[in-house]
Amino acid sequence: MRHYEIIFLVHPDQSEQVGGMVERYTKLIEEDGGKIHRLEDWGRRQLAYAINNVHKAHYVMLNVECTGKALAELEDNFRYNDAVIRNLVIRRDEAVTGQSEMLKAEENRSERRERRERPEHDGSADGDDSDSDSDNSDNADE
């Protein structure tokens, strides 16, 4: 069996169906003896260019180990499913199980956003405590 990285884009109006689609595709691969090494749902994202007058899509990425037969059946499912507007299958040399760069970048963005929001609240509270400590030490000297 070979390793593949599969990314497919689902029409934004069909986003509710993504869970069922992923379940159906993983079942198809596992029934043929394959394995799912990584599954990431990247959610709705802006497309770089419009596809059939659609500007957003729901992205899903799979890293799988499967037979050629299972991959061909999966590609047929993509081809005949109107909800899948694009798909990409890349053959990999080995299984990839770590987090994707896309997901890492998203987490970094959310962490930076949280850090930006925190100092406003934490900084003012720390500043008040240090002022009150210095006021107390001044009073102790008198």
Swiss-Prot record:
Keyword Ribonucleoprotein found: yes
Signal peptide: none
GO CC terms: cytosolic small ribosomal subunit
Start and end residues of each stretch annotated as Disordered: 96-142
GO biological processes: translation
InterPro entries registered for this protein in UniProt: Ribosomal_bS6 (IPR000529), Ribosomal_bS6_CS (IPR020815), Ribosomal_bS6_sf (IPR035980), Ribosomal_S6_plastid/chlpt (IPR020814), Transl_elong_EF1B/ribsomal_bS6 (IPR014717)
Basic and acidic residues bias locations: 103-124
The UniProt record lists the keyword rRNA-binding: yes
Keywords: Ribonucleoprotein, Ribosomal protein, RNA-binding, rRNA-binding
GO molecular function list: small ribosomal subunit rRNA binding; structural constituent of ribosome
Compositional bias of kind Acidic residues: 125-142
Protein task: Binds together with bS18 to 16S ribosomal RNA.
Cross-referenced PANTHER family: MITOCHONDRIAL 28S RIBOSOMAL PROTEIN S6, SMALL RIBOSOMAL SUBUNIT PROTEIN BS6M
Family note: Belongs to the bacterial ribosomal protein bS6 family.
Protein name per its UniProtKB record: Small ribosomal subunit protein bS6
Species this chain originates from: Pseudomonas fluorescens (strain Pf0-1)
Lineage: Bacteria, Pseudomonadati, Pseudomonadota, Gammaproteobacteria, Pseudomonadales
